[in-house]
């Protein structure tokens, strides 16, 4: 199952929300009405910020047979302290890309109007208080050089499931960077091999 918020944010006039279980559960409810779906082999995979949303949903939705977070993420505001917030604030007017990511895109996606509300809203995107509720086999990716993968190891260590795997992707093998975009075939090979073994496909 592949879910995302990109188009819905633009055409659906909705906003980014952390409670992704309220999105995934109705989708699984529907999937289970389809006779071609194997009810015991539903997989939830999250890419990019989906590496937060998929684990969040899996903490509440226990009909998922396997979980993939690419890359694994942790609490969005975990690295934010007063010094970091002040530094970001001072850079917003001189760093065009940072301004685009936070002010133009971030404010819009979260439906906020100021930096304080942006950081407050981002603090709702966290897994530390619910990660212990994830029950299914889980694969976490950790691509070298991916700026949003800094929480992958924390997520992996906090998981309390017997079948968990942390998969590294390196610049040397051409699979570093955000979501292994230049080596998705290698990503697919490693993930599908794990799924085949985990779910006896």
Predicted regions located by residue number:
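Short glycine-enriched nucleophile-adjacent loop
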Residues: 45, 51-62, 67-69
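Short beta-strand/loop motif that positions the catalytic acidic residue
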Residues: 134-135, 140-142
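Catalytic histidine neighborhood in serine/cysteine hydrolases
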Residues: 159-177
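Catalytic active-site module of serine/aspartate enzymes centered on a nucleophile-bearing elbow/loop
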Residues: 180-201
């Amino acid at each position: 199952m592949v879910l995302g918020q990109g188009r819905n944010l633009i055409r659906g006039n909705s906003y980014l929300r952390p409670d992704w279980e309220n999105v995934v559960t109705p989708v699984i409810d529907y999937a289970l009405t389809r006779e071609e779906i194997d009810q015991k082999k539903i997989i939830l995979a999250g890419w990019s910020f989906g590496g937060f949303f998929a684990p969040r949903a899996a903490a509440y939705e226990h009909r998922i047979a396997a979980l993939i977070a690419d890359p694994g993420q942790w609490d969005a505001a975990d690295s934010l302290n007063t010094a970091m917030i002040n530094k970001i604030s001072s850079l917003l007017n001189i760093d065009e890309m940072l301004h685009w990511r936070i002010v133009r895109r971030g404010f819009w996606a979260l439906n906020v109007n100021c930096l304080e509300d942006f950081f407050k809203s981002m603090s709702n995107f966290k897994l530390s208080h619910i990660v212990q509720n994830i029950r299914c086999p889980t694969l976490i990716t950790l691509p070298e050089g991916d700026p949003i993968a800094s929480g992958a190891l924390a997520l992996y260590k906090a998981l309390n499931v017997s079948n968990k795997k942390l998969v590294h992707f390196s610049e040397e093998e051409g699979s570093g960077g955000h979501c292994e975009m230049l080596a998705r075939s290698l990503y697919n090979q490693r993930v599908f091999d794990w799924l085949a073994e985990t779910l006896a496909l």
